[in-house]
Amino acid sequence: MSGPRFGSGVALLVVDVQNDFAHPKGSLSVRGAEAVIEEINDLIRDARAAGSPVVYTQDWHPPSTPHFDKDGGIWPVHCVADSWGAQFHPKLVLEGPYVRKGVGGEDGYSGFTMRHPVADEPVSTGLHELLREHEVAHVVVVGLATDYCVKFTALEALELGLETTVVRSAIAAVDVESGDGERALAEMVEAGAVVA
């Protein structure tokens, strides 16, 4: 299957390629994550060469948040603001703006919106506004993890009316339960995404 086409109206979204997810010593390391970084870098270069914007998402949590198991959530502490784990993986090519998720303790997985920890209302990360500034109608989604942040970013992109492509060779899954990644891909396809 051929890869995505970049150009006018198309943006590449690089989801959460950070040390805590992508590095083997990360607190929530995703198996196979380092192996997809070069493919992601190739797509970044292709997008930039075609004049497409590249936008990164970055998990950026306070030390205490309902997202963490120590505070009642389900995940180990990860991507705490200004920590090594929150930094982008050193092998990732960085050529574009980024939006941060969870800065104020919000919970969720999408690169577009999170849930306010008290009001339980959506809080924008600024991603949709950034894409509108660039007149983006189609997003290509890559990064980590297939079954969480990639999936919810792709699903919300579709809800916002954006054509959405997910590049199979440039994602990796947490697979808390065996097969979660494949089920997430099927859910994205059912919602209207193209898997390339």
What are these regions (language model features)?
Residues 109, 118-120, 134-140, 153:
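Hydrophobic, aromatic-enriched interface-forming segments
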Residues 136-152, 166-168:
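Glycine-rich anion-binding loop/nest that anchors nucleotide
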Residues 93-130:
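Histidine/lysine/aspartate-rich catalytic loop segments that bind and position anionic ligands
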Residues 77-82, 116-120, 143:
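Short, surface-exposed loop/turn motifs that are enriched in glycine and acidic residues
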Residues 43-44, 150-161:
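Histidine-anchored nucleotide/phosphate-binding helix
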Residues 85, 89, 124, 128, ...:
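Hydrophobic, well-ordered secondary-structure segments
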Residues 1-105, 133, 137, 162-166, ...:
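Active-site acidic carboxylates
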Residues 36, 40, 124, 150:
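Aromatic/hydrophobic pocket-lining residues that form the small-molecule binding cavity
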